[in-house]
Each structure stands twice: as structure tokens, then as C-alpha cells.
Regions:
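Terminal RNA-binding accessory module
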Residues: 336-440
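Conserved, mostly hydrophobic/aromatic
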Residues: 170, 187, 223, 251, ...
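Short acidic, glycine/proline-rich loop/turn micro-motifs
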Residues: 261-264, 332-336
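Glycine-centered loop/turn positions within well-structured domains
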Residues: 110, 148, 193, 258-259, ...
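Conserved SAM/AdoMet-binding glycine-rich loop
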Residues: 78-83, 88, 93, 179-303, ...
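Proteins enriched for Cys/Gly/acidic motifs involved in redox and nucleic-acid/cofactor modification
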Residues: 1-195, 234, 245, 249, ...
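Active-site proximal loops enriched in glycine and acidic residues that flank catalytic Cys/His/Asp
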Residues: 189, 225, 253-255, 291-295, ...
């Protein structure tokens, strides 16, 4: 390309893994395009879609339809769609939406990069373009795909088999992020605790944590999307003894009933799950646990749901999210079980579970009032810093709001403080957020 660069905008839908894919894409094409934040009048509009569950698919389809309308009205030039939705329905969507100029999958960005007139550069494989502004954290995708076959999940046939990124490549990528001012890495994958089995023939997450912690500038490393079956205990050793590894674990459990776990193909039972949670709390004192549950899965009757409620009450997860079961075509569930739990019952169970969790989260937050914690400043808005401690993960957990104090900050420009650490005394708490004051 010569002369004025064409403008290109990307809209990213879905999870943090999609965001990482977008950032890798932009690194490859940034020399050939002018990357813009506004979709209006962009020469190229790219949509990175999600196709995981019903609500996400609907959101992505609506986004494509709206973008197609804008293209028809002359507001955008070329319209290209990639990601999980197009990967999942690559055979059907081009016929249904011919106004889209190109459909690309989620497993390999190279066809899309080439369609944009750029030859993929090997030296840019571990580079990413972080969006405009100052950032304190970044997601680091350590593997692609999944070898698990949970009965409800469509990810394996969307994203393919598990494929670990070599440690040296991740260290290179993380070092590049640190050079851009990133202080916290959030490790993500479909199953982070499976990391390394395919290329090193053993679980290597603990080794990766150690290598990442040796990077200058990286201060916090956080683990998301761990899996309970065959959980590698050396990861807990890293968490307990490596000061850069946050005492925080995201471990989606999905249920506690033996019957439901078996139908879900989770490869654990309730006793194993309870023992693992106890071991985590014993080996890593003060660890904060985040989990995810599914309500309304086939086989979940009143008895199984009450068992789940009792487990959540006793386990006292500091963070918990929950979803209503969504039947997905092509999964084992869809082919073998009827979705017999009514939508009303699913919603009632979801409401009941989240009401219980609200009280647990509030009690945890109240217990922190009066404590002094190290926090990372993510944003500055309307006279307040938006911060997190090692016990809050970005984008999914609550925040710690701290009023800017020019005397305590020695009159520093508040915007220059984004991405730095300060000590804060917690003074107030609600169910999900905290308020604190700066301390010396």
C-alpha cells in the first residue's frame, strides 16, 4: 500500500481471549493501516465475534447486522468478520449475510492478515498493540483450544485441540508488554492448568509462572481459567512463595453434585472438589478464590440445586459468578439430554444463588475494613483513582475507589499515577466494591 493509509476499526466482542487475538492482529497490520477507534467512516470495519453461548451469539449476530446496515448506508467501507461465531458457522453465515465482504475463523489469524494485503511477519508473532491510553494490566493467552470434553461446551470444536504457547514465546510477549508499561499479567486459556502437556509432556504452569516473574517491570501475575481435575499442586507452591504470583485463583467448578458433575463430564466428584478447595486454603493462607457455577443443567433437580447452595454457603468463595444452562448444538448435552429445566426455574435458581453469594462477598469485604493494602491504579475518574489489590481481578471483580489527595501524592499529576502502586487503608465496603484512603 502507498500514499495515505486506509483507516481500520476493530470491534471486539466476547471474552478476554478475543481481545488478545485482536491485539495480535493489530500488531501485524499497524504499519499498513491507520487504526481508529471510531467505526464511522472507517475504510475497513472488522468484527471479532463470540459464538460460545446463546446470548453471546445473539450479540455478535446483532453487531454484524448493524455493521452491514452501516455499510449499506455508506458509513463504512469493507466489512470483515472473524472470531468464534464465524468459525462455528463458517458454512452457513456467508450465504445468510452476503453483504459481509469476508468471513474468517478463530484458530488462525493469517488468512485475515493476508486478506488485508499484509504478509504475516514472524518477528511480530509475540507482539501486540494495546489500545490507546495508559494501561496497568494485560491478558496473556498461554494456550489455544481445549482437550477437555465437557458435555455442555462448544469450545473444542470452535477453537480446536489444546495447543500450548512455548515458554520462551510467552516470556518474549510478556517482556514486550512490560516495556509498554504493563504491571500485571492475567494468564488466560481454556484451561490454564493443562498448560505444557502437549509440548513438554508435563504440566508446566508453575515453570511458566517462575519465568514470567523474572521479567523486570511485571509485579503481579494472576491465574484465570484453572481446572479442578488433576490440578498441579506446584502452582500452589508458586502462589504461596513467589511474591509476584497473586494469592488469587479463578477455578470454574460449575457444580458440586456428583450426579451433575458426571453428566457434565467434569472428571471430578464432589468429594474431590471439596478436598481441593480445602487444600488451596491450607497451602495458600489468605488466598481469594473465584469460581463459576451453572444452574439448570440437565440432571439438576431441587436436591442437586440445594446441594450446590449448601456447598457455596460453606465454601465461602470470595468471588462467584453463575450462568443459566444454555443448550448448544453439537455438544454432548444437546445430542443426548433434554433441556428439561424450565427457563423460569433456571432464573429463580440463578437469583437465589447470587443472593446467597452477595451476602458472602459483602461479609468478606466488610472484614477488610481497616486493613492497609497495596493497590494498582487502573484509572482516574472524577477525582477518584480506580484501583485493585491482588485480590481483585480486572473486569470481573469489584474495585477499590480512592479519592485523589494532592498532599499525600505530593501534588503529582493524577493521570501520571495510572499503572503505579500505592498503599491504601480500606474505610468502607459494599457487596462488591471498597473505598479507601491513601496512606504513606
Amino acid at each position: 500500500m502507498s500514499g495515505k493509509k486506509p483507516t481500520l476499526a476493530v470491534v471486539t466482542l466476547g471474552c478476554s481471549k478475543n481481545q488478545v487475538d485482536t491485539e495480535h492482529l493489530l500488531a501485524q497490520i499497524q504499519d499498513n493501516y491507520s487504526i481508529v477507534n471510531s467505526e464511522s467512516n472507517a475504510d475497513y470495519l472488522l468484527l471479532n465475534t463470540c459464538g460460545f453461548i446463546g446470548d453471546a451469539k445473539e450479540e455478535s449476530i446483532q453487531a454484524v447486522l448493524e455493521a452491514a446496515k452501516r455499510k449499506k448506508n455508506g458509513e463504512v467501507g469493507k466489512l470483515l468478520v472473524f472470531g468464534c461465531l464465524s468459525q462455528r458457522y463458517i458454512g452457513e453465515l456467508p450465504k445468510l449475510m452476503p453483504e459481509v465482504d469476508g468471513w474468517f475463523g478463530a484458530r488462525d489469524l493469517n488468512p485475515l492478515i493476508k486478506a488485508l494485503g499484509v504478509e504475516p511477519k514472524k518477528e511480530m508473532l509475540n507482539r501486540r498493540v494495546i489500545s490507546d491510553g495508559v494501561h496497568s494490566y494485560a491478558f496473556l493467552k498461554i494456550s489455544e483450544g481445549c482437550d477437555r470434553r465437557c458435555s455442555y461446551c462448544a469450545i473444542p470444536f470452535i477453537r480446536g485441540a489444546h495447543k500450548s504457547v512455548p515458554i520462551e514465546d510467552l516470556v518474549d510477549e510478556a517482556s514486550s508488554l512490560a516495556a509498554q508499561g504493563i504491571k500485571e499479567l492475567v494468564l488466560i486459556a481454556q484451561d490454564t492448568t493443562y498448560y505444557g502437556l502437549d509440548i513438554y509432556h508435563h504440566r508446566a504452569l508453575a515453570e511458566l509462572l517462575q519465568k514470567l516473574s523474572e521479567i523486570d517491570g511485571i509485579e503481579w501475575i494472576r491465574i484465570h481459567y484453572s481446572y479442578p481435575a488433576d490440578f498441579p499442586e506446584d502452582v500452589l507452591d508458586q502462589m504461596a512463595h513467589n511474591p509476584k504470583v497473586c494469592k488469587y485463583m479463578d477455578i470454574p467448578l460449575q457444580h458440586i453434585s456428583d450426579k451433575v458433575l458426571d453428566m457434565m463430564h467434569r472428571h471430578v466428584d464432589g468429594a474431590w472438589t471439596r478436598a481441593l478447595i480445602q487444600k488451596m486454603r491450607e497451602k495458600v493462607p489468605g488466598v481469594v478464590l473465584r469460581t463459576t457455577m451453572i444452574v439448570g443443567h440437565p440432571g439438576e433437580g431441587p436436591k442437586e440445586f440445594e446441594e450446590l447452595m449448601d456447598f457455596v454457603l460453606k465454601a465461602k468463595f470470595e468471588r462467584l459468578g453463575a450462568f443459566k444452562y444454555s443448550e448448544e448444538e453439537g455438544t454432548f448435552d444437546a445430542d443426548n439430554f433434554k433441556d428439561t429445566v424450565s427457563e423460569k426455574t433456571k432464573q429463580n435458581r440463578l437469583n437465589k444463588l447470587m443472593a446467597l453469594q452477595s451476602g458472602i462477598s459483602f461479609a468478606f469485604n466488610k472484614s477488610r475494613v481497616g486493613s492497609v493494602v497495596k493497590v494498582l491504579i487502573d484509572e482516574y475518574n472524577d477525582g477518584n483513582f480506580v484501583c485493585r489489590s491482588e485480590y481483585e481481578s480486572p473486569e470481573v471483580d469489584g474495585e477499590i475507589l480512592v479519592k485523589y489527595d494532592s498532599s499525600a501524592m505530593r501534588a503529582k499529576d493524577p493521570m501520571s499515577m495510572i499503572g503505579t502502586f500505592i498503599n491504601v487503608k480500606i474505610t468502607q465496603a459494599d457487596e462488591y466494591d471498597l473505598i479507601g484512603d491513601i496512606v504513606d
